[in-house]
């Protein structure tokens, strides 16, 4: 259970603007804007209801999503050293989200940014998140589109190749500059399957944004895959996939919510109460 885990650090502070502690060197303005829009959509769906408890899954040294006005933020990751440096959370807990049971209806918001592609059975983890959300709770996830060429190449190549790309082609110097982790890229996180899973779990998809990952964009520019050549490649992929695949849209951000009240259940309960009265 989440409350039984050992807290490794705790800030013991209230942060009016947690964003002031951002130092994520890879957070380019385009991705930052997409995540900010996701937060705005999540908060708008809550209609002004404040956030009591937020869970940031896989946050490491810095939270990529900051919910305004949250009373308490718990960050969790396997990276203990990274957690110790995270200044955007109130409590940092070293834990494996795959092996951890989350209490039912225990949090108001969950952020899971680029985590599900690294774990086995991400659909089960998604189900944990859905059960852990209180009524009105929101979930923001970011994952690669596993059907896109970038993810397919990643899945078919070893981690050593990924590290080579990061070091030699993207000029990353070490782990403090965002080196890659082993990936699973399970098919259950394909965008359409995530949307179906959300429906099964009783969540509403508030917003979905498909966009190009900054690493893919950097590599395209390095190898001059821009302009007409890139447009031709995109057209070819769209044609072969009958419009279902655009190689430029390599990643997605999705915003989901558990309804404040299930309309069908609420109507039945009210009807039964009225009949008894």
Residue ranges of model-derived segments:
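Conserved N-terminal segment of class I S-adenosyl-L-methionine
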Residues: 1-105, 109-111, 126, 210-211, ...
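Conserved aromatic
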Residues: 51, 119, 188-189
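Solvent-exposed polar/charged
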Residues: 66-67, 131, 199
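Conserved phosphate-binding and hydrolysis motifs of nucleotide-dependent enzymes
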Residues: 108, 136-137
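Short catalytic micro-motifs in class I SAM-dependent methyltransferases
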Residues: 113-118
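Helix-to-beta-strand junctions that scaffold the AdoMet/dcAdoMet cofactor pocket
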Residues: 119-120, 133-134
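S-adenosyl-L-methionine-dependent methyltransferase catalytic module, highlighting the catalytic core
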Residues: 123-124, 128, 138-272
């Amino acid at each position: 259970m989440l409350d039984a885990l050992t807290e490794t650090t705790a800030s013991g502070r209230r942060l009016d603007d947690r964003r002031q502690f951002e130092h994520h060197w890879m957070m380019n303005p385009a991705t930052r804007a997409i995540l900010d829009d996701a937060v705005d959509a999540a908060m708008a769906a809550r209609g002004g209801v404040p956030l009591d408890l937020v869970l940031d899954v896989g946050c490491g040294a810095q939270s990529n999503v900051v919910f305004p006005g949250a009373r308490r933020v718990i960050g969790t990751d396997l990276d203990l050293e990274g957690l110790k440096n995270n200044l955007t959370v109130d409590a940092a807990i070293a834990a494996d989200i795959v092996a951890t049971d989350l209490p039912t209806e225990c949090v108001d918001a969950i952020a899971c940014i680029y985590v599900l592609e690294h774990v086995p059975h991400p659909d089960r983890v998604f189900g944990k998140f859905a059960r852990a959300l209180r009524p009105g709770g929101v979930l923001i996830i970011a994952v690669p589109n596993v059907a896109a060429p970038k993810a397919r190449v990643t899945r078919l190549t070893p981690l050593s190749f990924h590290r080579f790309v990061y070091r030699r082609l993207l000029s990353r110097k070490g782990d403090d500059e965002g080196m890659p982790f082993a990936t699973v890229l399970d098919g259950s996180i394909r965008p359409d399957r995530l949307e179906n899973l959300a429906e099964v779990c009783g969540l509403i998809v508030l917003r979905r944004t498909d966009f190009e990952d900054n690493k893919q964009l950097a590599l395209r520019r390095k190898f001059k895959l821009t302009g007409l050549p890139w447009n031709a490649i995109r057209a070819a992929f769209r044609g072969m996939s009958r419009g279902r695949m655009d190689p430029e849209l390599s990643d997605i951000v999705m915003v989901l919510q558990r309804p404040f009240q299930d309309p069908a259940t609420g109507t039945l309960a009210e009807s039964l109460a009225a009949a008894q009265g």
